[in-house]
From Swiss-Prot:
EC number, UniProt record: 2.7.1.189
Reactions mediated catalytically: (S)-4,5-dihydroxypentane-2,3-dione + ATP = (2S)-2-hydroxy-3,4-dioxopentyl phosphate + ADP + H(+)
Subcellular location: Cytoplasm
Keywords assigned: Cytoplasm, Kinase, Transferase
Protein name: Autoinducer-2 kinase
Originating gene: lsrK
Known role: Catalyzes the phosphorylation of autoinducer-2 (AI-2) to phospho-AI-2, which subsequently inactivates the transcriptional regulator LsrR and leads to the transcription of the lsr operon. Phosphorylates the ring-open form of (S)-4,5-dihydroxypentane-2,3-dione (DPD), which is the precursor to all AI-2 signaling molecules, at the C5 position.
BP terms from Gene Ontology: carbohydrate metabolic process; quorum sensing
Source organism per UniProt: Yersinia pestis
Length: 530
């Protein structure tokens, strides 16, 4: 839990509920976008015995944790519940919740649930192996992470739940439902089910019918920033908010994060550096990738979509390197009172650009249709300790993350015609000054780093404010509230060097994938059914 700023000229505040993969937060903002206080709690997803890949979302415990966070945030902010003018919720995408016909939640799974591999394969075979292409052309999604295979799994193995189901929503919508009693989804999050039309921003029931699934479980669609309902007396008693507080439609975490970063116009580009890295490009109208390498999601801005590529485990790889190899640096950083990553960046800054040719093999470029990665490794190491050491490997990892991002952005530009003129870099990775400069050098465009690097909750609060008329519009408010810390200008000499390094890495990575294909090494990650 944290308390950041308790000074505001206004008596009006907004609350965002942010349901991530590993934790939930309740965050209070003033109307100038300053974070006042936050309550946070970790949560775990539940594997079902004898169901490989299952990760169920604990509805009872997680609502209790959410209520705990709301009360913590109010306490830390020293605010009465009456000061909260509106609340909205955002969440990890792909996670779904089912309700019975009376509106009671009965089953949910997290975004990481991978139980439905067999069902993915079964659905891919429909229409002479053309069903996945039909899904992608309509929704911008493939089957690997979509809701239909999970629903089919329930029909096969939990027909009791499947028969009871009356409505489906996303996890952000479940939070809004627990507060207000109302059921609806927004396009940005529901779009990741693979059942929503990118053009109409509404459900496409015929996709479920083609899959042999029920199409009568689709809830109403309401745009982000639309008033959904009000906090019920029951919810108020449980969570500490005032009964009657407006509850506004939120959305998907990445899209609301882009709103909080002011990435709201066609052509704008962001790299969000967390556990996964997302490369996001706003497109002027729905366009799909003919090679199915890139997912296309509805933005929270009506009429706009986002091309999104994902680099796998980028932040996790850095944490692994720090914890596995940098015990001395962790102790030194502790004594100096600085972050270990800052110390490692200082060391890596003394290594020449190109990291002496060391090539990390971790995440591949995104290939949404056939999504898997090579086995983790370092290639082209030297036995010269002056050239090949922890500083070199750390710099190589930062350079590689930037190279994969640049490759993903190039893929998007190839099919969409939208090429980044600058990049907004946010998330934990953007705290690294060297990393930000490397990203500018590799992409060849200026990189802007915001003051608020974790902007998802801010975007969610903006939606809450728009829903009750405190802000004029989502896009204008996102632009107005974002503040910039620094801009990094690309080094043209480094750009040429990194272009050659990118070409070499792509060739080596292709060979490494071949080792996985032969069963000689183990993939970093594979999509269900591959």
């Amino acid at each position: 839990m944290s308390q950041l700023d308790t000074t505001t000229p206004s008596g009006d505040y907004l609350m965002a509920l942010d349901a991530g993969t590993g934790s939930v937060r309740a965050v209070i903002f003033d109307l100038n976008g300053n974070q006042i206080a936050a309550g946070q709690a970790e949560w775990l997803h539940l594997p079902v015995p004898d169901v490989p890949g299952s990760m169920e979302f604990d509805l009872t415990t997680n609502w209790q944790l959410t209520c705990q966070c709301i009360r913590q945030a109010l306490h830390l902010a020293k605010l009465p519940a009456s000061a909260i003018r509106a609340v909205a919720a955002c969440s990890m995408r792909e996670g779904i919740v089912l309700y019975d016909r009376s509106g009671t939640p009965i089953w949910a799974c997290a975004n990481v649930d991978a139980r439905a591999s067999r069902e993915v394969s079964e659905l891919k075979e429909l229409h002479n192996n053309g069903f996945e292409l039909e899904v992608y052309q309509c929704s911008g999604q493939t089957l690997a992470l979509s809701a239909m295979p999970r629903l089919l799994w329930l029909a096969h193995y939990r027909p009791d739940i499947y028969r009871q189901a009356g409505t489906l929503t996303m996890i952000s919508d479940w939070l809004a439902n627990m507060l207000s009693g109302e059921l609806a989804v927004d396009p940005s999050n529901a779009g990741t089910t693979g059942m929503l039309d990118l053009v109409t921003r509404n459900w496409q029931p015929n996709l479920l019918e083609m899959a042999g699934l029920r199409a009568d479980i689709l809830s109403p669609v309401k745009e982000t920033g639309t008033l959904l309902g009000h906090v019920t007396a029951k919810a108020a008693q449980e969570c500490g908010l005032l009964a009657g507080t407006p509850v506004v439609m939120g959305g998907g975490d990445v899209q609301l994060g882009c709103l909080g970063l002011g990435v709201v116009h066609a052509g704008q580009t962001a790299v969000l550096g967390g556990t996964f890295w997302q490369q996001v490009v706003n497109l002027p109208q729905p366009i799909i990738d003919p090679n199915m390498n890139t997912r296309i999601n509805p933005h929270v801005i009506p009429g706009m979509v986002q091309a999104e590529s994902i680099s796998f485990f980028t932040g996790l790889t850095m944490r692994w390197f720090r914890d596995a190899f940098c015990a001395e640096e962790k102790l030194l950083a502790q004594r100096l009172g600085i972050d270990t990553y800052s110390l490692l960046e200082d060391m890596a800054a003394r290594v020449p650009a190109g990291a002496y040719g060391v090539m990390p093999i971790f995440s591949d470029v995104m290939r949404f249709k056939s999504w898997y990665h090579a086995a983790p490794s370092f290639i082209n190491l030297s036995l010269d300790p002056e050239k090949c050491n922890k500083a070199t490997l750390f710099r190589a990892l930062e350079e590689n993350a930037a190279i994969v991002s640049a490759c993903n952005l190039a893929q998007i530009a190839e099919f969409s015609g939208v090429k980044a003129s600058s990049v907004v870099f946010a998330g934990g990775g953007a705290k690294g000054k060297l990393w930000s400069q490397i990203l500018a050098d590799v992409t060849g465009v200026p990189v802007k780093v915001p003051v608020v690097k974790e902007a998802t909750a801010l975007g969610c609060a903006i939606a809450a404010g728009v829903g009750v008329g405190l802000y004029e519009a989502l896009d204008k408010t996102g632009e107005r509230l974002v503040r910039w810390e620094r801009e990094y200008i690309p080094n043209t000499e480094h750009k040429a060097l990194y272009q050659a390094a990118k070409t070499n890495w792509q060739a080596v990575y292709t060979d490494q994938l071949g080792l996985v294909d032969c069963g000689l090494t183990t993939s970093l990650w594979k999509a269900p059914c591959l």
